[in-house]
Amino acid sequence: MKARPTERPQKIRFRKLAPNYAQFVMPRRETGRDDIDRIEDRPFPKDPSRVIAISDGVFAVALTLLILDVKPPTVNQTLLASAIIATAPRLGIFALSFAIVAYYWVSHHFSFGYVRLIDRGLLWLNMLFLFTIVVLPFSAAVLADYPLAAPAITLYGANVAACSATLAIAWWYAVGKRLSIDVRRDERRRVAIRTMISPTLAIVGIAVATIAPVASLVLFVAIPVASYTLRPTR
């Protein structure tokens, strides 16, 4: 009986598939084929999902760290009411800082909702912005210990202004490098106004810290309130 020839296993060839990133860039009427090729040829991860994920994680940690500076009173029952009242300024600084960090998270969520591609420059600008967010619990703790001291108010105001500046730079970098989808001109104007609110109020708060520290704190409170009035329509 004639033996059957041994069949050699068929080699399976895998073809490297290049993802089509053209769907993530601006419409063809705004972006030519050369711009799409220029973005696709960059040897760098282009998916913004990981950048957004680590940003959300940093915001969650920063919001949690704020409350760690508020210690519960450890006194007997007869002094508990006065001890709770004594912690009111610290609780107020916590609430203010929570609102400011929440405002920056909303602004970051809104801005990066337009971003479809990430390059090295935008990645590091986002990390610089996250650095300013992580420092905010420290600035808040100093302000809670010395709520009417000009150096503490200056530190807090400078931190808030740095948060706004780095986020604004990241936004305009993404728009200038065509890493975002097409943004209407009126929407760009709205974002520009929003990015100028918090640094302006923070700088004014720093300027009047030595003569009117309470007014400085009021200006800090106005940052999330004023920004909410110009919230995005998306």
Label every PLM stretch briefly.
Residues M1-Q10:
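Extreme N-terminal basic, low-complexity initiation segments
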